[in-house]
Amino acid sequence: MKRIAACLLSLCLFSPFAFANTFTTDLTDLWWNESESGWGVTATHQREVVFLTFFVYGVDSRATFYTGQASYVSQASNGALIFSGPMYETAGPWIGLPFNPNLVTIRQVGTVTFTAFVDSATLTYNVDSTVVNKSLTRQTFRSNDLTGGYAGVFRQTSAGCSTPASNATVESVVGVAITNSLTALTMTTNESGTICDYVGNYRQSGRMGSSTGTFSCPGRTGTYEMLEIEANPSGVTGRITGRSNVCSQISGRLAIVKR
């Protein structure tokens, strides 16, 4: 893996794309095709590179090890993120023997392109003359439980509002209470005594969650969609879009830490 990592490092050093993947959707996850259970791809996303590990089968129907080093190329007109790069086949010593890295062999067998939205992707790759095209989604085997009390910042931009003064970006320090189940989410935000209630469904897609529903605040009601809900022991982050009876377009981000 050291030589693979060296190849990856050379891509990073000379890549023209120098942003951190915090500015894009984090694609790190286990990806699969639900109707083809038995194979899959693990994506590890660092900065502008997605390292892909394939668990697939060779012509002898035995497990075969491939890796792909896909660097960011562009964003498609439909919003998809496009990553592409070389694909390698590796072989090495049997696990029952002391590992000798000098026995590892690496051969480039083709290229791979990973075109991803938040929770779905297309995968195109070739192994020598064999070309494969697959549709993928993040694989979910457990759902996060967001239930708890939090404090943080809610940043929202409103547009198309009936009152011009409401067309603005506002950053609010909020207290947040969330109740979450496998299929439902309720969230209450408290900004200096101004209470807003969000009630909707909940869907887990790999490490990402999402929710759609309705919200009500003093003088405002509407619909919302929360995307890229990520949770860890410290807190929760996510993106939100929606509309209300006052503004036709709302977008923003939520970042909250556990109390």
Where do the model's predicted regions map?
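Positively charged n-region of N-terminal signal peptides that target proteins for export
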Residues: 1-4
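Cleavable N-terminal signal peptides
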Residues: 7-8, 18
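Generic detector of short alpha-helix boundary/capping microenvironments
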Residues: 8-9, 109
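N-terminal signal peptide c-region/cleavage motif recognized by signal peptidases
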Residues: 13-17
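Mature soluble binding/inhibitory domains
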Residues: 21-259
